[in-house]
Design a protein with these regions (language model features):
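Single conserved hydrophobic/aromatic residue that forms the stacking wall/gate
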Residues: 1-21
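Short acidic, glycine-rich surface-loop motifs adjacent to enzyme active sites
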Residues: 25, 121-142
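Active-site glycine-centered loops adjacent to acidic/histidine catalytic or metal-binding residues
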Residues: 26-27, 55-56, 135, 168-169
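Extended active-site neighborhood of metal-dependent phosphoesterases/phosphodiesterases
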Residues: 33-126, 145-166, 172-214, 218-221
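Binuclear metal-dependent phosphoesterase catalytic core
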Residues: 182-266, 304-336
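Short, surface-exposed loop motifs enriched in S/T, G, D/E and P with embedded aromatic residues
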Residues: 268-281, 300
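Aromatic sugar-binding surface patches on proteins
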Residues: 280-311
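Short beta-strand edge segments in extracellular beta-sheet folds
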Residues: 338-343
């Protein structure tokens, strides 16, 4: 049972008693409603408030209306949409799964929730910060940045406010500005890829997004389980990534367009690295090893190409390369590699 492992306690270590809370972004029991009571008991013992978001796998497979399919979830965790405040930030939880039974569903926010959210928005002071947590993402970046129609209406209702969507569902990690004043944080899985694989299928380490508010300022950073908070990048030597055999390749999994990723060769600044889209080399090697062992690979285990990779081609005489990534908040992360070594 996942929450009886150290994972939840590692996430929450240092948070208890420090004005913190956890938001679980859905698919809490993965089509196993008999686990709701046990999961709720584990949440209750964690020492911080835990706010639930309903996912498509939290619906009752034996029901054929959305209302009936969410009854078991609501019995254990309460309403599927609600709001709460922390600090100066207003948090709204929504259900953006319209369930039709037998695992068939639409990713939309129903009219009742949209009206409720719009009425909530009207009561907020101008320029408020609002975080909307829901399961499916508002925008699908891999489908030409297609935005959910009901999310467009939601953004219109919160125009004039600082709006953040916090979402899950995709098993990917990304931070995108959808429109002026609106950012979506689509968070990777804390369990790797569906508990089967040690990292997510886009190459993001298993972990969680940590949002902070301090003195009214709002920031975020990704925390990889079992790693120092300072570990935010992964660098490969030339020859380790087949698509870029002569290049140093860096992965920056919490990247957004406000980051800078630069490189140094033997201490000399060489400028910005080139962003590219790749299947993650580590994840691909993991899947290849499973195939070699005769394991059948499901479609949700296939590597997912992602655009948070960066390349630079060092000179033939270079002895060392350092990659430095700086996030939008000015935090600096670096990794050095000695050329000629592949360990």
């Amino acid at each position: 049972f996942f929450f009886k492992q150290k994972t939840a306690y590692e996430i929450l270590s240092g948070l208890v008693g420090s004005n913190q809370a956890a938001i679980v972004l859905g698919d809490i029991v993965w089509d196993s409603p008999e686990l709701f009571a046990g999961v709720k008991a584990e949440f209750a013992g964690l020492g911080v408030p835990v706010y639930g978001v309903i996912g498509n796998h939290d619906h009752d497979l034996n029901k054929y209306t959305d209302r009936e399919a969410t009854e078991n979830y609501r019995r254990h965790f309460g309403p599927t949409y609600y709001a709460f405040d922390m600090g100066r930030t207003h948090y709204i939880v929504l259900d953006d799964i319209v369930y039709h039974g037998a695992k068939k569903y639409e990713e939309q926010i129903d009219t009742m929730q949209l009206r409720w959210a719009a009425a909530y928005a009207e009561r907020l002071p101008a320029g408020s910060r609002v975080c909307i947590a829901m399961h499916a993402p508002a925008m699908k970046s891999w489908l030409g940045n297609r935005v959910m129609e009901s999310a467009e209406r939601l953004m219109d209702a919160f125009a004039g406010h600082e709006l953040h969507f916090i979402t899950g569902h995709t098993h990917l990690n990304s931070n995108y500005d959808i429109r002026e004043g609106v950012t979506e944080h689509n968070v990777a899985q804390v369990c790797g890829n569906l508990w089967w694989d040690p990292i997510n299928w886009d190459g993001t380490p298993k972990g969680f997004q940590l949002f902070r508010e301090c003195g009214g300022e709002f920031s975020w950073e990704y925390r990889s389980l079992g790693e120092s908070p300072a570990r935010q990048i992964r660098v490969w030597h030339p020859g380790q990534v087949a698509k870029h055999p002569a290049s140093v390749v860096a992965k920056v999994w919490n990247w957004d367009s406000y980051w800078t990723v630069v490189w140094y060769e033997d201490g000399r600044y060489r400028g910005a690295m080139q962003r590219t889209t790749l299947d993650d080399p580590d994840y691909t090697a993991h899947i290849d090893s499973l195939k070699a062992a005769g394991r059948k690979i499901s479609k949700v285990q296939r590597p997912r190409p992602t655009n948070f990779y960066f390349t630079a081609r060092p000179s033939a005489s270079a002895r060392e390369v350092e990659v430095v990534a700086t996030d939008r908040f000015g935090r600096r992360y670096s990794e050095r590699i000695a050329l000629g070594h592949t360990d």
